[in-house]
């Protein structure tokens, strides 16, 4: 899983010289995700992914700049979405990770045009990842009980 997430970050985030990035992925239960969604986004109910990007949040004078990204994913949302034809739990989890990384890269999906652009990028990145990884082998069925 680490390799897939590293590759996803490489595909989604711009490369910046002399800057490192720390990325934390958190998997939350629906209740916790709903609380975060209300507190930080102002929306009621659960959501699939929330991203926080703290550019230069960990800057230490004289040392390499470090950005910190936190991505919160709700596996229960992925499980529910996987009930739709052509979708799997594993591909939804990867999609949510990619979606969060694209937000961290500055992409938005608030307007119809932005949403279309973001969906195109999501499809491109997940397609590249799928050619390299078998999502079902990475996210074993046991992770559904998070």
Where are these regions (language model features)?
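An acidic/histidine-cluster motif and surrounding catalytic segment
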Residues: 1-94, 102-146
């Amino acid at each position: 899983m680490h390799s897939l997430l590293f590759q996803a970050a490489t595909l989604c985030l711009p490369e910046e010289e002399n800057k490192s990035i720390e990325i934390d992925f958190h998997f939350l239960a629906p209740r916790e995700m709903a609380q975060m969604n209300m507190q930080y986004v102002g929306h009621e109910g659960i959501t699939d992914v929330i991203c926080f990007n703290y550019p230069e949040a960990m800057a230490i004078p004289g040392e390499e700049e470090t950005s910190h990204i936190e991505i919160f994913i709700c596996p229960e949302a992925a499980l529910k979405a996987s009930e739709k034809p052509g979708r799997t739990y594993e591909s939804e989890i990867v999609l949510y990770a990619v979606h969060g990384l694209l937000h961290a890269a500055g992409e938005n999906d608030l307007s119809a045009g932005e949403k279309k652009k973001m969906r195109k990028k999501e499809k491109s990145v997940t397609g590249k990842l799928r050619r390299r990884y078998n999502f079902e082998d990475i996210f074993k069925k046991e992770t559904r009980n998070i």
